[in-house]
Amino acid sequence: MNSNRRKEIDRIMERIDSLIADISEIKDSIGAVRDEEQDALDNLPESMQEGERGERAQDAIDALEEALSGMEDAESGLNDIKDNLETAKE
C-alpha cells in the first residue's frame, strides 16, 4: 500500500477514534440516567414498586440497559474496524 492510502487510512482511523469518544460519552449519559431511574425506583415505597409506576420504571431501566448494550456493541464494532484498517496498512 502506498503512503497516500496509508495516510487516508490514518485519517479514517482518527474519525473512528472521535466516534468512539462520542460513544463513550453517550454511554456515560445513558448509564447516569439508568442509575437515576434505578435510585428513584428503589426509593419508592414497596407497594408502589410493585404497582404500575414501579413496572414503568423497571421497563425504562430495562430499555436503558438495552440502549447501553447497543452502544457497547457499536463501540466494539468500531474497534474491530480499526483493527482491520490497521491490518490493511501493513
Q: What kind of feature is each model-predicted range?
A:
Residues 2-90:
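Long, low-complexity or tandemly repetitive, helically biased scaffold regions used
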